[in-house]
Every structure is written in C-alpha cells, then in structure tokens.
Swiss-Prot record:
<feature type="binding site">
    <location>
        <position position="374"/>
    </location>
    <ligand>
        <name>S-adenosyl-L-methionine</name>
    </ligand>
</feature>
<dbReference type="InterPro" id="IPR002792">
    <property type="entry name" value="TRAM_dom"/>
</dbReference>
<feature type="binding site">
    <location>
        <position position="305"/>
    </location>
    <ligand>
        <name>S-adenosyl-L-methionine</name>
    </ligand>
</feature>
<keyword id="KW-0949">S-adenosyl-L-methionine</keyword>
<keyword id="KW-0808">Transferase</keyword>
<comment type="function">
    <text>Catalyzes the formation of 5-methyl-uridine at position 1939 (m5U1939) in 23S rRNA.</text>
</comment>
<dbReference type="InterPro" id="IPR010280">
    <property type="entry name" value="U5_MeTrfase_fam"/>
</dbReference>
<keyword id="KW-0411">Iron-sulfur</keyword>
<dbReference type="InterPro" id="IPR029063">
    <property type="entry name" value="SAM-dependent_MTases_sf"/>
</dbReference>
<keyword id="KW-0698">rRNA processing</keyword>
<feature type="active site" description="Nucleophile">
    <location>
        <position position="400"/>
    </location>
</feature>
<dbReference type="GO" id="GO:0005506">
    <property type="term" value="F:iron ion binding"/>
</dbReference>
<dbReference type="InterPro" id="IPR030391">
    <property type="entry name" value="MeTrfase_TrmA_CS"/>
</dbReference>
<feature type="binding site">
    <location>
        <position position="353"/>
    </location>
    <ligand>
        <name>S-adenosyl-L-methionine</name>
    </ligand>
</feature>
<feature type="domain" description="TRAM">
    <location>
        <begin position="5"/>
        <end position="67"/>
    </location>
</feature>
<keyword id="KW-0479">Metal-binding</keyword>
<dbReference type="Pfam" id="PF05958">
    <property type="entry name" value="tRNA_U5-meth_tr"/>
</dbReference>
Amino acid sequence: MARTRNRFDRTPFQTAITDLSHDGRGVARRDGEGGKVTFISGALPGELVRAEPTARSRHFDEAKTVEVLEASPQRVAPRCPHFGVCAGCVLQHLEESQQIVAKQRVLMDNLERIGHVTPQAVLPGLTGDNWGYRRKGRFSVRRVEKKAKTLVGFRELDPRFVADLSVCYTVIPQIGEKIPLLAALVEGMDGKRDIPQIEFIAGDDAVALTIRHMQPLSARDQQAWIAFAQEHGFAIFLQPGGVDSVHPLWPQEVPLSFRLPQWDVDLAFRPLDFIQVNASLNQKMIVHALALLDAKPDDRVLDLFCGLGNFTLPLARVVREVVGVEGDAGLVARAKDNAQRNGLDNAQFYAADLTQDQRNAAWMRQGFDKLLLDPPRSGALEVLQQLPLKTFERIVYVSCHPGSLARDAGYLVNEQGFTLVSAGAMDMFPHTAHVESIAVFERR
C-alpha cells in the first residue's frame, strides 16, 4: 500500500496504547482521526505516550514514541545502546517473561482471525537463552562516503540505512562483541566498497564468516582476513557469486557441526545452510515436538521440510522408520551424510519441491502413521492438499509464521476434519517480534 511521507502534520500527539501489534509496535486509536489506528514504535499496552507521526496511509498511521508519560509496569530499560534505531530487536523494552505472553496472544489472534480455529488447549510458551543466542545471521556492510567509514550491522528501523553498531547482545558474544573490529577491518581494505554483506554461523566447535564480495579480493585483503581469523578464532569463507561459489579461504578444513546430546546425534552443516538460530531453544523444541507427536517405537513418521535432519535424526532414534523430504538438494545430501555418520539406517531422505505436484512421488505413496512438518514462512498448504491426510493419526506442525500456520490450521480443521488439540508459541528470537509456534492436530 502506498504511504504518504511528504507533507503531513508531524506535530507530536498524546495517546493511550491499547494493544501490541504483530510486529511489536504499540496500537492506538486517535479520536481526532475518527478512531484511525496508529502503530507506534517503542510503546507498550497500558501506556500513555507522546508520539511523533512518521507516515500516513489510508487505513492506518505510523509514529514513534518521543516520551513515555505513564509507563507500563512491564517496561524495562533496554540493554542495547542501539535500541530504537536498529531493527534487529524491537521488544527489548518489554520485560522478558512478558515477551512470550505477547507472542502467545499474536498466535491465538491469528488462529482465530485467519484460520477460524481455536485450540482445545494452549501450550505453555517455550523459552531458551535470551541473550547471546543468535548463532546464525547476516550483517549488511556499507561504506558511507560522507562519514568516511564502513558500517557493519543489521538494518535500521528505516531499512534504507545500516545501523552503526558497537555491540549486539543477541548475537553470540564471539561475533556480537567484535562488530566494530569487523567494520574497522573492512574499512582498511582495498575492496571496502565491494563487500555488501557478511554472514556468520556457529557450530559447537567453530565460528565461520562468509564474505560476499562483488569483485575479486586483492592478495592484501585476503591476507587481512586470514590474519583476522587467526587472531579471533574464526574460519573465513568467500562468496564471489551465488551459493555454489562459497569456498574456504582459511582454514581449508572447517568442522562445522552441532550436537543433540539427548539423542546422541551430531549434525554437520555448511556455512550458508539453514540451522535453527537459538541452540538452547532448538533442543527444547525437539523434545517438545517429539513428545507432542507421541512417537512410538513401531511408528513410521513423515518429516516434511526436514533440512539437515534436525527432527528426522532424533526421530530415527525413537521410531521404526522416518522419511525426510526437503526442497534443497544440498541439504538432503547433508542429511543423508548425517544419518550415515550417526549410524542411523532407518532414516530415508528425498529431495522434492514441496510447492509442486508430488502425488506420484515414491515417498508420497508410502504409508505413515504420523506427520511432522517445519515449513518456511509461506507455510505448507500446497503439500497438505496433496497428502493422504486421513492416514495420519497425528500431525505436529512447527511454524515460523503464525499467519501461514493459521491458514493451514483452518484447512486441516475446517476442510479435512482434524481437531486442533493444542498450540503454543516458542521464543526462538527473544527481543524480536518474530513468533515461532507449534500446533498439534489429531484425526477425528
């Protein structure tokens, strides 16, 4: 929707906050605007604030908090000095125990409003580490000529700009405390204008940086990266083109993996592979999902969008057989290798685009007792519409977007005759508005 950012009244106004939006902003209705909704960054429910308008559109306005006149008892001082500028976190001003409560409300609202479903039970919110948890991410890199400096960080709330970060407390300390050193390193390079992003990922025994560069790195710049890696304990990968162009600069062999000790499983991965961001929450989530699935020794389980085998391989320790299906052929290859490395011969993997017709696929014709799925933000409706759903006793759906979960839940309950037994939020990304969730469906 087009927004008007040119000529409108930016005079600060006083208003009461009634709710929290799905993206972590306070919600107000201005009587002088005919009850028009205004989304106000930095505001919490129950507060009285003075806010400055920042954008207007036909159906809603946007503003930012300039003064809190009456604070919520749930308000806390943000730990990060960049809060309110950096878009990496938007909920640091909300007490930690209340963040999962807010996310539960977002989930339930989506289920009722979009899916027209209500769970029989609300699962307790699942939480893990709140600080230093982010083991995978991507920093934007930008040379600002007017300031004669290089910025490394996440985007600002205004996504046109890169936040000038001195630290990030949600990123693992090995990375979050070294952001200024990264910026200074790039600033001193010959190709400082040719590096648009730096990705980071951490295993249990190594931390890797992948440098996206638009032009070949000079020998001097390559040596600078190697020296930085040796001093700070990083592995460096270079990415001159697409994903397939990623290759190690130093060292040549990097043991990237993470362990799931409860199931005696070790998952190896590559520097741009998808892994769950929050290691402690991931382990709790797997325990939670397998318990909700009620996996039994004689079960055959289908695991869709299986990735590296994050759920598949723990399931293989519990059930008779598990089949994992994933759209990324590289991840499937790694999942097969992981199964072999862990001595699991009861896990099969298939590469398949789950947004396309799979009704004649070999894995689709196999019989299964239960289904676990962990789709991307777009959800799983296309594949759900093809599955022989009535053969599954139970479905556990792990979601990274409450809207697509709600849509798919509506399909399962209102069109396919399943019962939504329970659902609940999981705080994979503390201090952000991101809502991870899990839902359980049973055949009626």
